[in-house]
């Protein structure tokens, strides 16, 4: 699992059962609350950090490591949890086929939970939203709320985040910048352009200076009487600048 992989999913109450049914149909296993859930909790996160034995392992192998029996063809282990606090192991970045699943009464509540998960899981990376394309207000609201550099709409996070496969706005790359939010120097997918040394030759150029001159400039010795007469009687000027 790459860093852009889904780590948690938040589902609205109105479609929660339907989504859960679809997950099960697709080969996901919902951990039973109690012993099964706790066993996997203690396996995926140890002393507040990811257990280095689970990345690269299948859902079946992780369950076996935790002492939980699941079908061998299980694709994802899902833990239905409530807390988005860092004390909840399923709220962490897991880098494995293990998901935390949350439910929310409203879209705003779902956003709040997602914001917290991003805050503790790591600012700057990737957030996904599955919504009807016509609901542009929700898309805009989600994009504004998520402090991530990749905002994916109706796109698988793993494959969408690396660009090219499901969208053409992200450059194809397996090195994904997280911007200053994530302590990176770039906020986009790192590509060839970031590895090129570009020379810039800058010749001296100075900013243009200008000043506004009057319609007439009187000079030469003896011009003063004529100048003042013309300015006052012909041009009807009341002020003159004398250098």
What does each model-found stretch correspond to?
Residues 1-85:
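ALDH superfamily catalytic-core signature
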Residues 6, 124, 237-239:
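A general structural motif
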Residues 11, 79-80, 101-105, 217-224:
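Short acidic-hydrophobic, aromatic-tinged amphipathic segments that line or gate anion-handling sites
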Residues 14, 134-137, 222:
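Alpha-helix/helix-capping structural signal
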Residues 18-22, 61-65, 109, 113, ...:
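Alpha-helical scaffold segments in soluble metabolic enzymes
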Residues 68-208:
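Conserved C-terminal structural/oligomerization subdomain of aldehyde/semialdehyde dehydrogenase
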Residues 207-243:
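An N-terminal, well-structured beta->alpha segment
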């Amino acid at each position: 699992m790459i860093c852009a992989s889904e780590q948690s999913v938040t589902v609205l109450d109105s479609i929660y059962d339907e989504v859960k049914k679809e997950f099960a149909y697709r080969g996901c296993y919902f951990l039973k609350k109690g012993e099964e859930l706790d066993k996997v909790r203690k396996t995926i996160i140890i002393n507040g950090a990811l257990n280095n034995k689970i990345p690269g392992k299948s859902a079946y192998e992780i369950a076996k490591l935790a002492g939980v029996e699941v079908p061998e063809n299980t694709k994802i282990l899902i833990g239905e949890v409530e807390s988005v606090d860092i004390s909840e192991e399923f709220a962490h970045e897991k880098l494995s086929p293990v998901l935390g699943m949350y439910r929310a009464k409203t879209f705003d509540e779902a956003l709040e939970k997602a914001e917290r998960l991003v805050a503790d899981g790591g600012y700057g990376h990737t957030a996904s939203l599955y919504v009807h394309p016509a609901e542009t207000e929700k898309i805009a609201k989600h994009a504004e709320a998520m402090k991530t550099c990749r905002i994916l709409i109706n796109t698988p996070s793993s494959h969408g985040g690396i660009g090219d496969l499901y969208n053409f706005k992200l450059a194809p790359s397996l090195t994904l910048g997280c911007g200053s939010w994530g302590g990176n120097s770039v906020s986009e997918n790192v590509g060839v352009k970031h590895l090129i040394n570009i020379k810039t030759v800058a010749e001296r150029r100075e900013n243009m200076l200008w000043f506004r001159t009057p319609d007439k400039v009187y000079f030469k010795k003896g011009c003063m009487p004529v100048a003042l007469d013309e300015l006052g009687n012909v041009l009807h000027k009341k002020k003159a600048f004398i250098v």
